[in-house]
């Protein structure tokens, strides 16, 4: 298992060579710095402490400055521990870049969901409304919470109630990495991830067993003209049509 910190930039879409559209989220992954290594001998477990985004010393405190100097770096705005065997190969002060992952990897992305404020059960829990007519006063209220006979009026844990919606840590699992660019410092993952734009996210190897995913080849306009890319797409489509025609002839 391995992991890295980044920031959500937003969503866009890319096209594969065969013309398939894939919605992707762009994650800005600047180099992370290893600030500390936790070992079983000293701490009882193995983990790597990563720092992300520099902070001016005048905006930091002495403990944070001293901790960062052990890794020969500036104090960091965000510090996270990653419990991962593969990360133990990095030494203190080493940089962890976006090429830690590659296209075709399946990852989990953890972040803080968008805060929605105080919401009722209809919005927060998708609860049904009450009767809207015939003298009913129960339109958007919660409804029954407990019974006096069976559980003596005790409200069970997990009952849908109004309250804070969003603003909590959540994880989107099994997202495919579409592209990694270590030079520009970004990762494209398929689908959406939690949090607002510029929100901090943690990209980690998925914890669930998944099948091996074949990397997809997407159209890149860097250094080439649109006409050249369209010619490549046309050639691919022609090859697919030709192979289908051969299969049809053999079937006859």
Please describe what each predicted stretch is.
Residues 1-252:
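Extended basic (Lys/Arg/His-rich) segments that typically form rRNA-contacting surfaces
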């Amino acid at each position: 298992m391995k992991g890295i910190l980044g920031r959500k930039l937003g969503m866009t879409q890319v096209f594969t060579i065969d013309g398939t559209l894939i919605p992707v989220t762009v994650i800005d992954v600047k180099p992370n710095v290893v600030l500390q290594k936790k070992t079983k001998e000293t701490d009882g477990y193995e983990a790597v402490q990563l720092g992300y985004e520099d902070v001016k010393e005048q905006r930091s405190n002495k403990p944070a400055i001293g901790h960062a100097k052990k890794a020969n770096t500036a104090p960091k705005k965000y510090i996270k521990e990653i419990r991962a065997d593969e990360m133990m190969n990095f030494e203190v002060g080493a940089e962890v870049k976006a090429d830690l992952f590659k296209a075709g990897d399946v990852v989990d992305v953890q972040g803080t969901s968008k805060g929605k404020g105080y919401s009722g059960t209809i919005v927060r829990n998708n609860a049904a409304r009450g009767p809207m007519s015939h003298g009913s006063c129960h339109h958007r209220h919660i409804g029954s919470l407990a019974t006096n006979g069976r559980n003596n009026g005790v409200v069970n844990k997990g009952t849908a109630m109004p309250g804070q919606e969003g603003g909590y840590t959540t994880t989107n699992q099994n997202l495919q990495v579409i592209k990694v660019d270590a030079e520009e410092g970004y990762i494209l993952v398929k689908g959406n991830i939690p949090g607002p734009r510029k929100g901090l996210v943690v990209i980690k190897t998925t914890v669930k067993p998944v099948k091996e995913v074949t990397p997809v080849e997407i159209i890149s306009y860097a250094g080439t003209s649109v006409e050249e890319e369209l010619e490549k797409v046309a050639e691919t489509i022609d090859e697919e049509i030709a192979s289908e025609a051969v299969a049809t002839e053999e079937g006859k």
